[in-house]
Amino acid sequence: MALFLGASSFVFAGTEPQIETPTQQTELQRGGGGIILKDENSHDLFSIESTYTLRSDFKDEPRLGHGDSFYGDFSYDHRFLITGKWYFRAGVEYERFDFDGSDNGLPDHLQTFHGHFALEYVVHDHAGAGLELDPGAYYQDDITGDAVDIPWKIFVSFPLKKDKIFGVIGLGGALYQDPVVAPGGGLIWLFSDKMRLEGVFPKPALVYNPTDDWQIRLQGELVYESFRTDDVVTPLQKLQVHNAVVQYNEDRAGVQVSYSGFEPFKITAGAGCTFIRAFDFFRVGVREKLDPAPYFRISLDAKF
């Protein structure tokens, strides 16, 4: 089960699966030269996010002390129309985890700078199918050749009951994740115009839209990402390694509220509990976990 969830984070990372029931991508306008097709999908996508998880103790290993985590993410993408509803999307993303607390030899930060290259089928700003590569450096401090990874994902959504229930299946992988390749998927159920279930990992959610501008999500989230470390010398004899791969993960659940009345921006604030934080040095068989702790999040997204 843990392997499936870890891999599914690559399958759907960076997406918020939503199904729009309208099927028209373009609208007709009359201009001086006749009828013109107007593209209804956004072409520029911007996102910035910060998440802070408060301090907690390391589970089962008191010599490692305690720690907290701060996550920051920035991304920008541009969609290029190919034909019909097919787009090529290209962009960049910078992510960074910072860890504070006891000086225990574990990484005090992990970061990645990578590109986005995707072929997508887009309806009303949501990708219903896609293939994406995210090549880049996934590292602690030093960018070396063995810090380069190419996470990839492929997915497709399809109706199970017209305008009501949709299925999502996918496959994803990366050189430094564990396992290297694994499946993912889930269901999306539209209860009404205002409420739906997005049962798709890594962000399953119950979503309520009281108005066009406000959205409330009861959401789970599974974050798994692998990095090349530098020197990791801890008080534990079993965890003294150099140039090792670590798969860091945070599993959490909480509530978040979004407001999109200031077009083209969407502002989101959230809070809840991070149930699991773990440093998994899976190639040497060592995984160190922290106790649960509260988290807080704020993000800003724009589509134009």
What are these regions (language model features)?
Residues 96-105, 202-285, 289, 294:
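Outer-membrane beta-barrel translocator/channel fold
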Residues 185-189, 194, 255-263, 289-304:
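Outer-membrane beta-barrel "beta-signal"
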Residues 1-8:
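Bacterial N-terminal signal peptides
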Residues 82-88, 125-131, 163-168, 194-197, ...:
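Repeated loop/turn-to-beta-strand initiation elements of outer-membrane beta-barrel proteins
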Residues 76-80, 119-121, 158-160, 173, ...:
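Residue-level signature of outer-membrane beta-barrel architecture
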Residues 46-54, 90-96, 131-137, 169-173, ...:
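Transmembrane beta-barrel strands of outer-membrane/channel proteins
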Residues 17-149, 243-252, 285:
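Transmembrane beta-barrel domains of bacterial outer-membrane proteins
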Residues 63-68, 107-109, 140-147, 172-181, ...:
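Solvent-exposed loop/turn segments connecting transmembrane beta-strands
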